[in-house]
Amino acid sequence: MSPLRVEHSHYVGPVSDLSHKDLLATEPGPPPTLLPEDPAVAELADNGRERFLEIVSAHPTSSLCWALLAEGSLKINSPEGNVGAYAYARTGYHRGLDLLRRSGWRGSGPIPWEHVPNRGFLRSLYALAVAAERIGDTVEQERCLQFLRDSSATAFAELTGQSQVTESSSGDRPQ
C-alpha cells in the first residue's frame, strides 16, 4: 500500500502520484521565455521590401518590425537617424516587454536567441543600446547591454560580435 499525502486535510492521492523530480537538484533560475510566432515575419519574408511600411502598420506590436526600422535608421548614422533609431528601438523594446510579460516572463530569466520569435525583442534591445550610445545616453546603453547579456549570451555575441566575458547571470532585470 502506498503512503498517502495530505494537504489541508484533503486526500490528494498516493505519494507515487508525485512527479519524480530530484528534490536535491537546484534550479538555475526562471525557465526560458519563448515568445509566440510573430505574424509579421511571414509577410516580411514574402514581400517586405515592397510593402514594408504597410506591414509595420499592420503589425504595430511586432518587435521585429521596430528593430528593422531602428537598424535601418542606425545605418544612416546621422543625428536624425540616431534619434529615429532610438525611438524605433524603444518602441520595439516596450512592445517586446509587453509580449514577454504576457508569455510568463516576470522580469528575469533567459530569453534565448535560439528561439527565433525572441529575436525581434533582442534586436530591438541591442538597437536601443547602440542608439543610446550615439545620442550620448551611456547609462541607457550600459543598462541595455547588460540586459542583453543577462537575457541571452548568444544574442549578445551575435549582435555585438563579442563573446561573453563571464557566464550569463540568471537574467534578473529590474523593470
Each predicted region: which residue ranges?
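Solvent-exposed loop and edge beta-strand segments that line ligand/cofactor-binding
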Residues: E54-A58, P112-P117
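Acidic, Ser/Thr- and Gly/Pro-rich intrinsically disordered linkers and low-complexity segments
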Residues: L100-H115
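Start-of-helix signal in alpha-solenoid helical-repeat scaffolds, especially tetratricopeptide repeats
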Residues: S63, H115-L122
